[in-house]
Amino acid sequence: MPDAYVESLGKMIAILVNYKPGSITLENITRLCQTMGLESFVDQVSANISRLSIASKIIVIDIDYEVTDGKVIDVKLVLASNFDKFDYFNGEANILHRSLTTYSDLHEFHHNLKFLTLLDACSSIDIESNVSQFDLFEYYSMLPQYMQSYLDDNGAQLTVQTNLNDRFGIYLLDHSEKKVAKLTFAATQDPNQRYYEYKYSSETKEWINQSAESYTTGITLVFELLGDPPTYLPKDSLPPEHPDEGFTSASASELQRRFAFKCQNPRVTLVNDFTVDVYPASTFQLLNDNICLCFDILRRQKWWHTVLYPISQLLLHQGQDSAVGDAPAPAAQPPLHRRRSSNKGCRRASAAESATLGDENMHQLTLTEIMNKSVIPEDDAMMDDRIELYVNENYVYLGTQEGCSFYNDPIERWEAFVESLRQMLT
């Protein structure tokens, strides 16, 4: 009962801190440390400068505060371990210092402090003997190098950068420096869940765990897809630790969330060839060797934003000759059309009927004119020109002429196919 009470109280405090983190003062920083269970004490460095020291099992943060002006002038982080190259910078910028000097409240500093305390709590280090089974501070600092080598070896044209926007995190950027994905750490629901140290080997091109003793518990690596619109992925392509509980049952909310291709373009016959449903997915728990799924997830993200999503938008476009609000075109095969007989009821026109046509000054067609004249209605002709488009979670085909595949084709082929389809429909 006491444990449940303490846990509930901790959640309430976290909600209040997130809602209103408070302005950046020495007193508010001290209170924040108290709510997080961190030790803190203040020393008077000089007449105008106070130093707040924040300490836990491994981390020690010294914050120098100018009392007269009421602002932070310096922040330093020291680790009580044998690793002294922990990355808390973005280039030359100290993100702990920036989170206390660039913003109007403690929100960013609180976010960074939670990250540090998580690594502190979950690192498997014996401080007295200075023996480390799994130092998460060292692993976080080495992971960007592992990830860059992994992406380069798989041909992903992405650049790895750390601690952007004054927040801890490992970011993946494309050629235009747009943030595509982010790696960070988070606590697991099961505090006994093991997380092993996996390093990337450029020789074997694999993620390997070099020691069965190199593990910790209660933490996991989290891979987050960034950007808009959201990415939809096939259910069977997600890692087992995907945190979205909506995938466990076919609930009503799940049915509403899955993506459905719709066709309103009268020039297209859509053949929905999906074998699984696709759902919005952005966050993935990459426990242990599942870190090797990063490239597959990134390729799925690229496939969605390059092929499937643009095609879904093209199908919603009704064409230049269709008014907004027209009913969507039926996704059915066009009917077969026969040349209509010029005879009525298979009988010959009588002389009287011929005379009547002449008397009414109506043009009498010759046999040659009848044979050369198109007798297929304009609407039917348009249906004969419909494009048959097959869409699947792994491929897209335009009739039997051309297509592109998630597994077999390069990204350039994806882009060329979508552009070809766009030109046909616009």
Curated annotation (Swiss-Prot):
Disordered: region residues: 324-356
Places the protein is found: Nucleus
Gene Ontology biological process: negative regulation of transcription by RNA polymerase II; positive regulation of transcription elongation by RNA polymerase II; positive regulation of transcription initiation by RNA polymerase II; RNA polymerase II preinitiation complex assembly
Gene Ontology CC: one annotated term: core mediator complex
A single GO molecular function term of this UniProt record: transcription coregulator activity
Subcellular location, principal: nucleus
Keywords: Activator, Nucleus, Transcription, Transcription regulation
Nucleus found in the keyword field: yes
Domain of life (superkingdom): Eukaryota
Biased composition (Basic residues): 336-347
Its job: Component of the Mediator complex, a coactivator involved in the regulated transcription of nearly all RNA polymerase II-dependent genes. Mediator functions as a bridge to convey information from gene-specific regulatory proteins to the basal RNA polymerase II transcription machinery. Mediator is recruited to promoters by direct interactions with regulatory proteins and serves as a scaffold for the assembly of a functional preinitiation complex with RNA polymerase II and the general transcription factors.
Oligomeric form and interacting partners: Component of the Mediator complex.
Family membership noted in the UniProt record: Belongs to the Mediator complex subunit 1 family.
Name under which the protein is recorded: Mediator of RNA polymerase II transcription subunit 1
Gene designation per UniProt: MED1
